[in-house]
């Protein structure tokens, strides 16, 4: 099978729409010249986009092209601005080069023109280093601007649906409640119990493939805001001003360094995460609670829900593979988080003081408010009749004192009491609950005295924010690898003279030693012994966690995740380390005063063997003496984390998903028998290969009984920006998690079709064959490691300053490097860069072929095909798996990937491996078509299909340039601009593909 033919097939499958206007050219005139900035030709936008009737009336009568017209209009507009800026900043020569490359790439993409491909390669090879950087920046920034336009269009379409009075959209709480009502599961009792017991926590993480600089994100945020303004009726003057501001922000983008000069520190990652709280979470999460309560009220359901939706973070606490995370970074993380939330509270309380000018000469206040007013330091005669203002001044001074005692003087900006006024030293709040109690006093009094509407705009959201964020903002998880814990425990045992070589003990003997040490009130650690740097560092993190909990409350740090959990002792070792550092209170295993109040130890099952062993490990853990009492103190809850990344690298896309499914079901059965509430923590990434894809479908496709209102899921560093940089998009993503959790919890039968046993048997057969195919390529093909390191930019990614954590667990010595030692995240990121995205599909085609070929006769084969089709139609798990794979295949490009294969010096190896990949791609595409009935990619999602196709002419030059630059770099060219060009292509391709990493 010749790869060139396959490449042509792939390009035809990804053929672009025929109108050049839809591609969003850098310039919009035929001769490649940009329109003059002064030309006020924007009448289409003014007449079509600013009239309410045009947006809202008769939506059913509009074609898809009509609906997407504003999107392409925005892309053209932003492309024109970028073209103007390129011409202005770099001159006509660079602009013409960029435009010529763009037109050639479009021709290559649309017409399968081999001559255009050769022309493109020649043009790219002739670029000077300076021109190369400019071309890469132009195409990269176009990808960023196209992303902004797409996000705006999603928001626009939702608004149009709302204005038209359309039925609630899937992924909204209103839609979920309608579904529950239809099924008879929307009673007040059912929903009250759901919200009382629920806990939903998105957990922000930082990862080695996070490529966005905060400066770039800030500029993009401004562009998104200004673009949204253009949907409103604007005067000619307002529109001209808007365009000038957009031009200024695009110019600022061009003049801003896209890459970091130095690798991110953990402190940088902390600040990056906090920026999303300021732009999105602090306002949108309380607003989401308001929306949920309003939707419930419409159905006559509970009017107020507890703080079931909270935020988590790994940044500053995740030590696995990152030696830069220490007790000091944990301290920095919690202090910066606390500073952000306390500053927010102070600002909101100050604004409330200006707004709640209620006079008791006109309306009353309850005794509790009067007591707060009397206790206030405010003695102004001008406010003697304004109890709410006086009470708020008292609350403000107590908040300021709370910030001062926790963070130090001057850490959080505090307004003075006025010129010449002495500083007020109020009593700090003991905890955030006391602050919430004071806000509740104000709310209750307003409601009692016809002032409920006064509370709604600011006081109610502030009270909700305080319930959700506390004084800590976000709960920081601690994480470390099990082998590190073992090393520290072994040192403690050895230095105490208990066991000379704990690590060499059998599993049973380890547990005996650990349980004995836990039951002994005497510590193993002595203040008179000097321990290794590793032991001191690890124990220091535990001690810092104890201090943080004392200072900011137990929610500030409450979970400890153990990477590479393979045995029961991996869990118990962390309990012992907690005992040694004072985190565990009471005596382990004692009948009275049993161990409690420590961090919940959470196993992370990552590889295929570990997932298969998960239920056994937890069963044996529960059976240990003292564990039952410990879990009872945890509220009879236990969390288990499942890793999507390593299981995929270990067994491939299909097997990873299936083994996760099986592990979840086994855990559900075990926990049900033990009467323990199971909370699954899904370690999902950005790419489909790492559990990515639409969150709504991902949660709905969970096995029956695995959600039950309890879910935590990672929001990985590399896709946080796409989900939460835009507040409106962020609100939608947060709501989607709630809606999906509601449906998955209270409509579990939707993922338990009648033929489930037959479906699962077929899935097991597919998984076995897929894993064999995947491992045959990745782990059993001689030379595959060399192929991977040559045919992807993995080495160059490792050099890029895109995260505080190294991209590999071990140094990549060419003689000793192994796929097993590479982190799963850069592994997936690299396959995305070369446009193969192998981690999201490889093995499926062979699996389906083997399953169908295994049928004894033609009739049996037909039955198997029918079963697979029924699985796709009636089993959300399988349908979601195929949908995600469909999206990945739409983003693959064998023609581009073949250019990367040319980087492999060994011709025989190159031909052997690449042809195997091409053959599997074709088998997979054919199998998917046979099951779904759709030959083309994303047939059921035309907007996404067009979005992906429209990106290709702007991604292609970046990929071709990346190959050319890597070739020069590896040949010994040390030009700094060349290296910078490679890193810029990595950034641009990641932006174009969106869900990367």
From Swiss-Prot:
Disulfides per UniProt: none
Magnesium listed as a keyword: yes
Gene: ppc
Family: Belongs to the PEPCase type 1 family.
Residues covered by region (Disordered): 1-67
Enzyme nomenclature, EC number: 4.1.1.31
Pfam families the UniProt entry points to: PEPcase (PF00311)
Biological classification of the source: Bacteria, Pseudomonadati, Pseudomonadota, Betaproteobacteria, Burkholderiales
A biological process term (GO) from this entry: oxaloacetate metabolic process
Assigned GO CC terms: cytosol
Name of the protein in its database record: Phosphoenolpyruvate carboxylase
Cofactor(s) annotated in UniProt: Mg(2+)
Keyword Cell wall biogenesis/degradation applies: no
Protein function: Forms oxaloacetate, a four-carbon dicarboxylic acid source for the tricarboxylic acid cycle.
Gene Ontology terms for molecular function: magnesium ion binding; phosphoenolpyruvate carboxylase activity
NCBIfam families in UniProt: PRK00009.1
Keywords assigned: Carbon dioxide fixation, Lyase, Magnesium
Top EC category: lyase
Active site: 207, 649
Catalytic activity: oxaloacetate + phosphate = phosphoenolpyruvate + hydrogencarbonate
């Amino acid at each position: 099978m010749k790869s060139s033919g396959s490449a042509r097939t792939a390009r035809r499958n990804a053929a672009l729409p025929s109108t050049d206007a839809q591609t969003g050219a850098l310039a919009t005139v035929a001769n490649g010249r940009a329109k003059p900035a002064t030309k006020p030709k924007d009448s289409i936008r003014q007449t079509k986009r600013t009239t309410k009737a045009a947006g809202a009336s008769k939506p059913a009568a509009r074609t898809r092209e009509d609906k997407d017209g504003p999107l392409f209009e925005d892309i053209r507009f932003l492309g024109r601005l970028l073209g103007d800026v390129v011409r202005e900043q770099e001159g006509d020569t660079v602009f013409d080069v960029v435009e010529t490359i763009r037109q050639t790439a479009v021709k290559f993409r649309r017409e399968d023109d081999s001559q255009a491909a050769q022309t493109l390669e020649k043009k790219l090879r002739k670029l000077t280093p300076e021109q190369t950087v400019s071309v890469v920046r132009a195409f990269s920034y176009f990808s960023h601007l196209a992303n902004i336009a797409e996000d705006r269009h999603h928001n626009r379409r939702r608004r149009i649906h709302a204005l038209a009075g359309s039925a609630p959209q899937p992924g909204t709480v209103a839609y979920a409640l309608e579904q529950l009502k239809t099924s008879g599961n929307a009673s007040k009792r059912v929903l009250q119990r759901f919200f009382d017991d629920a806990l939903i926590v998105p957990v922000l993480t930082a990862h080695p493939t996070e490529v966005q600089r905060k400066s770039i994100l800030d500029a993009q945020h401004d562009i998104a805001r200004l673009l949204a303004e253009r949907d409103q009726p604007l005067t000619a003057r307002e529109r001209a001003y808007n365009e000038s501001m957009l031009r200024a922000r695009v110019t600022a983008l061009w003049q801003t360094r896209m890459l970091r000069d130095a690798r991110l520190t953990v402190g940088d990652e902390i600040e990056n995460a906090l920026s999303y709280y300021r732009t999105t979470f602090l306002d949108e999460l309380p607003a989401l609670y308001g929306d949920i309560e309003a939707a419930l009220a419409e159905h006559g359901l509970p009017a107020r829900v507890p703080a079931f939706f909270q935020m988590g973070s790994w940044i500053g606490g995740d030590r696995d593979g990152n030696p830069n995370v220490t007790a000091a970074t944990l301290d920095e993380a919690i202090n910066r988080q606390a500073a952000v939330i306390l500053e927010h509270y102070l600002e909101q309380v100050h604004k409330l003081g200006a707004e709640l000018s209620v006079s008791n000469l006109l309306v009353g206040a309850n005794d509790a408010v009067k007591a707060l007013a009397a206790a206030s330091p405010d003695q102004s005669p001008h406010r003697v009749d304004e109890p709410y203002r006086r009470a708020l001044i008292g609350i403000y001074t107590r908040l300021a004192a709370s910030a001062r005692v926790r963070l130090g003087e001057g850490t959080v900006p505090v307004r003075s009491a006025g010129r010449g006024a002495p500083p007020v030293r109020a009593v700090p709040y003991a905890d955030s609950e006391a602050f919430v109690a004071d806000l509740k006093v104000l709310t209750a009094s307003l409601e009692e005295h016809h002032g409920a509407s006064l509370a709604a705009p600011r006081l109610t959201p502030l009270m909700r924010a305080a319930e959700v964020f506390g004084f800590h903002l976000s709960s920081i998880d601690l994480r470390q690898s099990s082998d590190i814990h073992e090393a520290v425990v072994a040192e403690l045992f050895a230095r105490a003279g208990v066991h000379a070589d704990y690590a060499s003990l059998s599993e049973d003997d380890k547990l005996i030693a650990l349980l004995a040490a836990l039951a002994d009130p005497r510590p193993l650690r002595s203040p008179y012994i000097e321990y290794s740097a590793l032991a001191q560092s690890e124990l220091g993190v535990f001690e810092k966690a104890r201090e943080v909990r004392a200072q900011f409350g137990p929610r500030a740090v409450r979970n400890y995740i153990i990477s590479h959990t393979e045995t029961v002792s991996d869990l118990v070792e962390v309990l012992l380390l907690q005992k040694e550092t004072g985190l565990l209170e009471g005596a382990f295993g004692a009948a009275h005063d049993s161990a409690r109040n420590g961090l919940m130890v959470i196993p992370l099952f990552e590889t295929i063997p570990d997932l298969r062993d998960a239920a056994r490990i937890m069963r044996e853990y529960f059976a240990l003496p003292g564990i039952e009492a410990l879990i009872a103190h945890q509220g009879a809850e236990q969390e288990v984390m499942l890793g999507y990344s390593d299981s995929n690298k270990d067994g491939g896309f299909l097997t990873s998903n299936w083994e996760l499914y099986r592990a979840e079901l086994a855990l559900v059965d075990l926990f049900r028998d033990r009467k323990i509430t199971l909370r699954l923590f899904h370690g999902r990434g950005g790419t489909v290969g790492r559990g990515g894809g639409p969150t709504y479908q991902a949660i709905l496709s969970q096995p029956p009984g695995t959600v039950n209102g309890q879910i935590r899921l990672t929001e990985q560093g590399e896709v946080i920006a796409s989900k939460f940089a835009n507040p409106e998009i962020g609100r939608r993503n947060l709501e989607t998690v709630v809606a999906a959790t509601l449906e998955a919890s209270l409509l579990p039968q939707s993922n338990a079709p009648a033929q489930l046993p037959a479906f699962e048997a077929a899935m097991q057969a597919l998984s076995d064959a897929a894993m064999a195919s995947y491992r045959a390529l990745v782990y059993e093909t001689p030379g595959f490691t060399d192929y991977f390191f040559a045919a992807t930019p993995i080495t160059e990614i490792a050099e890029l300053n895109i995260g505080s954590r190294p991209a590999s667990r071990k140094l990549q010595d060419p003689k000793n490097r192994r796929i097993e030692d590479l982190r799963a995240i850069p592994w997936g990121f690299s396959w995305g860069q070369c446009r193969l995205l192998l981690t999201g599909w490889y093995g499926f085609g062979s699996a389906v072929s083997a399953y169908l070929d295994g049928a004894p006769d033609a009739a049996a084969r037909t039955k198997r095909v029918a079963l697979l089709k029924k699985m796709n139609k009636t089993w959300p798990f399988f349908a979601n798996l195929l949908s995600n794979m469909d999206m990945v295949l739409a983003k693959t490009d064998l023609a581009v990937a073949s250019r990367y294969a040319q980087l492999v010096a060994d011709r025989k190896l190159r031909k052997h491996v690449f042809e195997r990949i091409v053959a599997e791609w074709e088998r997979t595409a054919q199998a998917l078509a046979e099951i779904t009935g759709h030959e083309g990619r994303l047939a059921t999602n035309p907007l996404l299909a067009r979005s992906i196709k429209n990106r290709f002419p702007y991604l292609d030059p970046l990929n071709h340039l990346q190959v050319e630059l890597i070739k020069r770099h590896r040949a010994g060219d040390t030009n700094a601009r060349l290296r910078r060009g490679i890193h810029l292509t990595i950034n641009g391709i990641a932006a174009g593909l969106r869900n990367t990493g």
